[in-house]
From Swiss-Prot:
Listed HAMAP family: UPF0154
Listed transmembrane segments: 4-24
Species the sequence originates in: Levilactobacillus brevis (strain ATCC 367 / BCRC 12310 / CIP 105137 / JCM 1170 / LMG 11437 / NCIMB 947 / NCTC 947)
Protein name in UniProt: UPF0154 protein LVIS_1358
Family per record: Belongs to the UPF0154 family.
Keyword Phosphoprotein included in the entry's annotation: no
Length: 74
């Protein structure tokens, strides 16, 4: 076979693998987030109670806002 055919085959296979990997990773992350949702206010309240703090609604909102802001930065 000619060299250009091998190069074309390698490029096509590489693109197919990249597309398959992307969609596979996307599906995996969707399932992971469905099974393990991000932290919510109830979980944060329980965590604060375990640490011995009395969680006020203001403090909960403040911590949730800080966590969301940190998540956006990354």
């Amino acid at each position: 076979m000619a060299t250009w055919i091998w190069i074309l085959i390698v490029i096509v296979v590489g693109l197919a693998c990249a597309a398959g990997g992307f969609y596979g990773a996307r599906k995996y992350m969707e399932n992971y987030l469905k099974d393990n949702p991000p932290i919510n206010e109830d979980q944060l309240r329980a965590m604060m109670l375990q640490m011995g703090q009395k969680p006020s609604q203001r403090k909960l909102h403040q911590m949730m806002a800080a966590m969301q802001q940190n998540a956006r930065k990354k």
